[in-house]
């Protein structure tokens, strides 16, 4: 994060180590996944693509095209400034999921399983289709599901059961 607490580092480096030390959890990637919806879906894919050896990931109604999200006023009342500062274009950076996915594949890095789900009435639906098509064209191990529904918790809870 540009400002505030560094939640990404906490999730990326500290939380899994802590949990594996206090609970009988597997350290294997195939036994661990991280899931989130909306910006949390973005974060789950970013964590998995930044640390492909650690997690599989599920993204429910996720912000998969961070540039679209920054350039359009798609979510009233939400400010990405604490996360990205004054950035208006994150293409080709470690914040861009398209870039991270392609970089990993180009480098021959073994990627985790990715699960992507979205409602067909979600305002992020077209972006999710764009990411799905991009990932599948790169032969990424991506499973995509869609269901009728909007960008709300009712759909998120329904889709979470399938993860």
Question: Residue locations for each model-derived region?
Answer:
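Non-catalytic cap/lid and distal C-terminal segments of serine-dependent acyl enzymes
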Residues: 1-163
